[in-house]
Amino acid sequence: SKIYIDKTNALNQIKVLQKIFNNIVGNSRLPMLVIDSKNDNLNRNNFNASAAAVSGFSMFANEVVYLLDKDGNIDYVNLNNFLNKHSKSKFLVFGFTYNIFLNLINQLKINKLSQKNFSKAFLIHGGGWKKIEKQKIKRGTFNELLNKKLNIKNVINYYGLVEQIGSIFFECKCGYFIASNFSEIIIRDENFKECKDGESGIIQLISLLPTSYPGHNILTEDVGEIVKNHNCTCYGYGKRFLIHGRLKDAELRGCSNI
C-alpha cells in the first residue's frame, strides 16, 4: 500500500513537529549524530521508515553525521571528529531504539573514543522495541544503560506513525507520552467501546493534520492506557498515556523492520 502526502500536508506536518520539538529541545538547530548508515538513508529505491524518520528530524540539525559506515560498522573517525567538535555543547543523537541498543549500548568501544562524555546530548529514539523486549530490556533499563556507559541523561522516546510526523507523541521525564493540541488518543476495549482512564485497551489515534490521505482516525494494533491521576508537570497539557505493546497475535512488525 502507498500513502500519498502532498506538499501542503507535508509542510503542515513539519510545522507542527517543529512546534512540539522546540518545546522539548529549544529553538536552535543543533548538530545531530544519526545511529544509522548514510548509504541506507540516501538510497531512494529502498526508502523505508528509518530513512523517512531521519529525513524528518534532520530539519532540526545544522549538521548531520552518521555513526555507521557503508558496511554497518561504527565509524570511529567520524564519531570522534563529531565529538571533538560538538561534545561541549548541546547536540542531538537520533536513531531507532534497536539501532541505539545494538550500536551505542552493545558494540561501541569506549576506549576508542576521544571524548567519553555525552552529557550534553539529547537522545531521541523510537520504534524497534519488539527486538529489544525479547532480551528483557525495558525503558528504565535502556535509559540506565545509556547513562552508565555514556552519561546520557536526556533520553526521549517517541510514538507515532512515520507518515504523520506532526502527530507524534514524545515521552516526558515522568515516563508518559503526551498528546499535543493537534492530536488525540482514545483507548478502546475488545468490543471497541471506550475504556475508562487507567484501563488497558487498543489505541486509537486521531489527528487534525492529514489532508491528502485518510489518516484522521486510525485504530492501531497497539495496546496502551490513559493515565488520569498523575503529578506530571512536563510540557503540554494533553492526555498522558502509556504504551504496553502489541495486541496478542498482531503482526509483529514495526519501524525497526519496515
Predicted region positions:
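Hydrophobic alpha-helical hairpins/lids featuring a short glycine-rich hinge
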Residues: Q18, N22-S28, M32
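Active-site glycine/GP-rich loop and adjacent strand/helix microenvironment
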Residues: R29-L33, R44-N48, A52-I258
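Short acidic (Asp/Glu) patches
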Residues: A10-I20, V77
